[in-house]
């Protein structure tokens, strides 16, 4: 993903969730996705999809069973 795409994704997340705490980072050797953080906490990955000329982005978040027991 380009720096411009990363910035747009970050701005979108911050606007939708009414915060300024999202961070979007490039992945080291993978160009079709980025890492999403809220403050310092890793949340998941966003993948860029291109199907039949349509570009979209998919968010993938894993929630560990152990994390759910904390609540």
Where in this protein do the model-derived segments appear?
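Terminal leader/tail segments of proteins
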Residues: 1-71
């Amino acid at each position: 993903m380009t720096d411009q795409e990363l910035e747009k994704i970050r701005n979108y997340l911050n606007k939708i969730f009414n915060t300024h705490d999202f961070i979007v980072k490039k992945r080291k050797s993978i160009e079709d996705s980025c890492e999403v953080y809220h403050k310092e906490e890793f949340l998941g990955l966003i993948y860029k999809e291109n199907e039949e000329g349509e570009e979209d982005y998919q968010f993938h978040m894993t929630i560990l069973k152990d994390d759910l027991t904390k609540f």
